[in-house]
């Protein structure tokens, strides 16, 4: 009988110990979940605060410095519902180019002329100008007076856009880039489209800019030239900032 009582007491003690241990585990789990929840809340709070570290004016000023200090870049120009008209009734549908300040430019363009799609390349540096024959694709030297690109200045395009935009506003912050909407007067886009513009027209633009000021993309939306529509969008993408570019005169046969 004595042994039975002792065993009974031992069982009660073990049961109480197990209850305490299980209760302790529950508390630990709850505390762990509590700490994890607090950590997640803090991280979300920090991320939401760090998403927009600059105002639109601040990020544009940073971008001005970045653009002014950059010596080279590459770009592409495409269109949605339109094209860019150059002298000689040349309608650029697509173009890509390489730029080195102050005066080195290479452009490869697809041009629609008299309902024909033509491809030509244009190169200039050291006050010399070359262009390819759209039929033979062979290079030839040209005087600047015959240069179809003489009214545009790709080197100046991004400078004009970033320095002359107005009413800028951050619309979103995605993939570590600021998406900004703004307006610009059509006269300030002559470096892109030349003199064939609708004067004094307020034009909507959208910019994607990295926190270091690097410009990824600019959308120019609406009417800039006489044949544009409200749905015309010029899409300019920039890349390879400050990467070395090799320049040499084309081989002319």
Annotate each predicted stretch with a short phrase:
Residues 2-44:
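Sec-dependent bacterial lipoprotein signal peptides
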Residues 39-104, 243-253:
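N-terminal leader/targeting segments and the immediate start of mature chains
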Residues 59-65, 94-101, 120-129, 204-211, ...:
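Extended lipid/amphipathic-ligand handling interfaces
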Residues 71-74, 101-108, 175-181, 214-217:
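Short, hydrophobic/aromatic-rich segments at coil-to-beta transitions
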Residues 78-84, 112-116, 134-136, 223-227, ...:
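Hydrophobic lipid-interacting interfaces of membrane-associated proteins
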Residues 96-154:
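An acidic-aromatic
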Residues 131-191, 195-197:
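Flexible, processing/modification-adjacent segments and terminal tails
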Residues 178-252:
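Gly/Pro-enriched, hydrophobic low-complexity segments
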């Amino acid at each position: 009988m004595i042994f039975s009582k002792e065993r009974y007491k031992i069982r009660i003690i073990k049961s109480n110990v197990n209850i305490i241990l299980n209760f302790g585990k529950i508390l630990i789990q709850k505390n762990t979940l509590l700490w994890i929840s607090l950590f997640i809340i803090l991280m979300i709070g920090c991320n939401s605060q760090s998403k927009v570290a600059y105002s639109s004016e601040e990020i544009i000023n940073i971008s001005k410095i970045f653009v002014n200090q950059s010596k080279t870049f590459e770009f592409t120009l495409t269109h949605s519902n339109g094209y860019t008209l150059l002298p000689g009734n040349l309608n650029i549908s697509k173009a890509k180019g390489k730029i080195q300040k102050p005066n080195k430019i290479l452009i490869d363009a697809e041009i629609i002329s008299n309902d024909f799609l033509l491809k030509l390349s244009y190169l200039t540096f050291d006050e010399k100008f070359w262009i390819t024959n759209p039929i033979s694709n062979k290079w030839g030297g040209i005087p600047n007076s015959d240069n179809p690109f003489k009214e545009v200045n790709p080197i100046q395009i991004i400078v004009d856009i970033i320095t002359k935009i107005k009413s800028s506003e951050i619309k979103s912050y995605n993939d570590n880039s600021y998406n900004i909407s703004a307006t610009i007067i059509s006269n300030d886009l002559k470096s892109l489209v030349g003199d064939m513009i609708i004067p004094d027209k307020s034009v909507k633009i959208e910019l994607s800019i990295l926190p270091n000021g690097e410009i990824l993309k600019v959308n120019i939306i609406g009417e800039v030239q006489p044949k544009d529509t409200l749905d015309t969008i010029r899409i300019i993408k920039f890349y390879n900032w400050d990467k070395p570019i090799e320049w040499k005169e084309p081989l002319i046969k």
